[in-house]
Amino acid sequence: MIKAPNIILVGPMGAGKTTIGRLISQSMGKEFYDLDKVIEDNAGADIPWIFEREGEDGFRKRETQALASIVESDTGDCVLATGGGIVMREENRDILRENALVVYLYASVAQQLYRTSKSTHRPLLQTGDPRATLKKLFEIRDPLYRDVATLVIETDSRHPRSVANKVLDAIKRHLKMEITVS
């Protein structure tokens, strides 16, 4: 059997990283981590509180520390769902590229808005115009997600199980390709 590396999911808010991550970790028999939950557990506080007290920069520093800690301690043995802004720091992009098979779960701005419309735990969306915020974030982050991604999977209008199966199939194809190419 082919041993898969760490599988790290990146993408915007509402792409389904946590839901899909749980499903594929169960199928692959790997440990699952939600990076935001790890950060909250380490800080003893929730993300909105961290943003309020330390600002986005303080949160991003915690995010880098948590990411590095997970990939170093469980090399080849986990599925990790990241926060939407993981790609904003070059250091994080380097860690992602060097330590994992990175899956970009693509979601359009319209889909992101639909999926996040009822959420109160997304500090960056606590604005008068969430659509404009999501559009701006997408324009900045989409090229960065693509830069670190090994695989890109579209999630718009798809059921989580369907997306998870698509991710698993793409991972299998990718790993077979890696083995046959020498």
Curated annotation (Swiss-Prot):
Required co-factor(s) are: Mg(2+)
Spell out the CDD domains in the cross-references: SK (cd00464)
Please tell me where ATP binds in this chain: 14-19, 122
* Binding-site positions, Mg(2+): 18
Identify which top EC class this enzyme belongs to: transferase
Under the heading SUPFAM superfamilies, the entry gives:
P-loop containing nucleoside triphosphate hydrolases
The record's catalysed reaction(s) read: shikimate + ATP = 3-phosphoshikimate + ADP + H(+)
Q: What's a single GO MF annotation on this record?
A: shikimate kinase activity
Q: Which UniProt keywords apply?
A: Amino-acid biosynthesis, Aromatic amino acid biosynthesis, ATP-binding, Cytoplasm, Kinase, Magnesium, Metal-binding, Nucleotide-binding, Transferase
Q: What is its main location?
A: cytoplasm
List the GO biological process terms: amino acid biosynthetic process; aromatic amino acid family biosynthetic process; chorismate biosynthetic process
Q: What is its EC number?
A: 2.7.1.71
| Involved pathway(s) | Metabolic intermediate biosynthesis; chorismate biosynthesis; chorismate from D-erythrose 4-phosphate and phosphoenolpyruvate: step 5/7
Binding annotation for substrate: 36, 60, 84, 141
- What does the cofactor section's free text say about binding? Binds 1 Mg(2+) ion per subunit.
InterPro entries the record matches: P-loop_NTPase (IPR027417), Shikimate/glucono_kinase (IPR031322), Shikimate_kinase/TSH1 (IPR000623), Shikimate_kinase_CS (IPR023000)
Q: Family assignment?
A: Belongs to the shikimate kinase family.
Q: Its function?
A: Catalyzes the specific phosphorylation of the 3-hydroxyl group of shikimic acid using ATP as a cosubstrate.
Q: Which PANTHER family match?
A: SHIKIMATE KINASE, SHIKIMATE KINASE 1, CHLOROPLASTIC
UniProt name for this protein: Shikimate kinase
- UniProt organism field: Marinomonas sp. (strain MWYL1)
